[in-house]
Swiss-Prot record:
Superkingdom, natural source: Bacteria
Gene from which the chain derives: rpsU
Keyword Ribosomal protein in annotation: yes
Protein name, UniProt field: Small ribosomal subunit protein bS21
Organism per entry: Marinomonas sp. (strain MWYL1)
Keywords on record: Ribonucleoprotein, Ribosomal protein
Length: 71
């Protein structure tokens, strides 16, 4: 859990903004959303496989664009 120490004479808004930023960096909200409800192991595997396919397609697309002739 991220913690923020409020400095002397620091406005609450700025401290809250720093706390939100530290929570975002730590990935707290993403983790909460992921654990919000139970997801079956088969669904997790399907999601991981779909992400791998998407990453591969993106990589191939970038490689095709790199070797594309520009004439």
């Amino acid at each position: 859990m991220p913690a923020v120490k409020v400095k002397d004479n620091e406005p609450f808004d700025i401290a809250l903004r720093r706390f939100k930023r530290s929570c975002e960096k730590a990935g707290v909200l993403a983790e909460v959303r992921r654990r919000e409800c139970y997801e079956k192991p088969t669904t997790l595997r399907k999601r991981a496989a779909a992400a791998a396919v998407k990453r591969h397609a993106k990589k191939v697309s970038r490689e095709q664009k790199k070797f594309q002739r520009l004439y």
